[in-house]
Amino acid sequence: MKKIFLLFTLVFSFGVLADDHLPENFSMYQTNFLFNCPEPEMCFAAFDKYMNSPMVSKEKFEVDFFALQQNGWDESTHGVSWYFKDADQYAKAGELFATTKAGREFRKSMNNLEVETISDTLTVHSYGKVLAGETADNVVSLRWSLEVTDPAKFVPLWVNFSKSIEKYDWTSNGYGLQTHYLGNNGTGITHEIWASFNTVQDALAFLSGLNNSKEFAEYSPKSREYSKFKRSYMEVSLKQYNPD
């Protein structure tokens, strides 16, 4: 019952927030898969073949295949995120994966390569903002995974902090907050904070500026009252399909 109540609280509080604080081109739902791939080139080739199969490619799903860097938290080496505009797109993607020949061949390839799925989650954007650049150009992102214990207090604190660092030349091209609805992460993660950049160098400059800023020094101890840090890592996009 406690988990059900917490889920209701998250859905209600963040659902209201999402309606008022998302750019029009942001997806309604995201599915995120982190996995360990012993042979990255072959994993990518198998996924690319699936995405370019006739039945899948005609749907023009927005998808990102990426590599993980500085991920010392588990065995994930790569990931795939799907961005769905609505529930119908989400349902269609699941149907094609489960019922088509292309989906069957892709699953067989992954099994033959001994790919291990580490996490599989369904998330929604609770807050998002684009400051500069296009999605296709912002190929690097930093991510922080949290267990938020008091969303009503954490979210406005984080939003105000994020806005306060927009003025710096090292700030990100975009940032957002995602809420976990379903899936396995094994560590109590409820939310993800992300910040996007054109290059790895820009992301590193952001980290330096962030950690030396007075705003972060003030925000950090307050945020720990309402959230628990779980992990952080960098994502570098290897290929984007139909970026919006």
Question: Which residues does each PLM region occupy?
Answer:
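Positively charged n-region of N-terminal signal peptides that target proteins for export
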Residues: M1-I4
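Internal alpha-helical transmembrane segments of multi-pass membrane proteins, especially GPCRs
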Residues: L6-T9
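N-terminal signal peptide c-region/cleavage motif recognized by signal peptidases
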Residues: S13-F14
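Short S/T/G/P-rich N-terminal loop/turn motif that feeds into the first structured element of a domain
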Residues: A18-E218, K222-D244
